[in-house]
Design a protein with these regions (language model features):
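Catalytic and substrate-binding regions of cell-wall glycan-acting enzymes that process beta-1,4-linked
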Residues: 111-165
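Second-shell loop/turn segments in exported
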Residues: 5-9, 19-22, 45-54, 73-85, ...
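Short glycine/serine- and small hydrophobic-enriched flexible loop segments
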Residues: 38, 93-100
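Surface-exposed patches in mature extracellular/periplasmic domains of secreted proteins
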Residues: 32-34, 76, 103-114
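Cell-wall polysaccharide-cleaving catalytic domain and substrate-binding groove, primarily
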Residues: 18, 38-58, 62-63, 119
Length: 165
């Protein structure tokens, strides 16, 4: 049991320096970024998703392209997302962008996580009436059980990582 605990501890902290750096650059909570990485890839920088997502934060081509363009990075290609630093920078930038779309709400992070997971078009469909500004109503309006679970699991894991600085 002690060996399992030690291995999990090492894995849990394997990307801390990269996470802290990206969080600092994009003025984001490192505990949130780490929780997203935990949920997306369990800290595996070579993780591959079913529809082309890559790396720690499971970034897709479109998101990576937006990040590279916004940051003035030329000659960027999707394969570079296997690089942990590039992946976490792109993912953190993209999550910040998603959260920024929802500043008018009581909890922009909830809406941003839904957008990161399910896409902006779904969030726009779910955020009508009370759900437009009330995160509890918004979560209830989400039609995908996996997206609801995604948001709640990241919230719980974020609390576990709260001391990351």
């Amino acid at each position: 049991a002690a060996l399992w605990w030690w291995r999990e501890y090492q894995l849990d902290h394997s990307q801390d320096a990269i996470i802290i750096a990206a969080a600092s650059i994009y003025e984001m909570d490192p505990a949130l970024i780490k929780a997203v990485i935990w949920r997306e890839s369990r800290f595996n920088p070579e993780a591959r998703g079913a529809v082309g997502e890559l790396g720690l934060m499971q970034i897709r081509d479109m998101a990576a392209g937006e990040w590279a363009k916004a940051e003035g990075i030329t000659n960027f290609h999707h394969g570079q997302l296997i690089n942990a630093k590039s992946n976490v920078l792109a993912g953190t930038w993209y999550l910040k962008k998603a959260i920024s779309h929802h500043k008018h709400t009581d909890d922009p992070v909830v809406y941003g996580l839904a957008e990161y997971n399910a896409g902006r078009s779904h969030v726009l469909k779910w955020n009508s009436g009370d759900a437009a500004t009330n995160s509890v109503a918004f979560i209830e309006a989400i039609e995908f059980p996996a997206t609801k679970e995604y948001i709640l699991s990241i919230g719980k894991r974020r609390e576990k990582y709260r001391d990351l600085r």
